Amino acid sequence: MKKEFRSAPNFSEQKHVNVDRENSTIKNIEIAKYGRNKNLTFFDDKFLDDLVKKGNEQKQGVKSRFGHPNMCASSLGTFVGRYKNFRVENRKAYADLTLDPITKKTSVEGKGIKMYDYIMDMAESNSDMFGNSIVIMGDEYENEIENEKGEKEWENVQVLHSLLASDLVDDPAATDALFSVGNDFGVT
């Protein structure tokens, strides 16, 4: 049965990020990675490839919001931009986020700062304190997966039907941070 899935956030220890303020773009954002995520489902290589394919099929880009919508709050006013240029490298899916001009006019609720400045400043100086969380339609099945030690383990493998959004959150499930650990992307 198809159901909506929101991954838990991923964080990174990366301190140097690819933030291009001139073009309102944050490059090389880790979207998802191979393995068991914080929601206890497993992203295999096929899932990552399908995620990249579905992301690149959306010619306008994949919607990104400031946090996930929930039953207590509307998502209206939380749009921040679009992800494009999806790709897989070393069993991790990456994309580039271009912030919409509206983020320069929209304030982070109760924080006294514009979304644009908050997101760009955090990406430059505290990329390990937030990440993104994919919102998909999919289902899962149980399958035997070989772990790093060569042992077989049963996992709930996620199957992707559609990619709805990838939201900026303070606690991502599908990654460890905004950027992949161990890569020096530099600041532009």
What is the predicted function of each stretch?
Residues 58-74, 86, 132:
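Short conserved beta-strand and strand-loop elements enriched in small hydrophobics
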Residues 11-19, 78-88, 140-144:
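Short amphipathic beta-strand and strand-loop transition segments with alternating hydrophobic
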Residues 53, 68, 73-77, 87-90, ...:
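Basic, nucleic-acid-interacting segments
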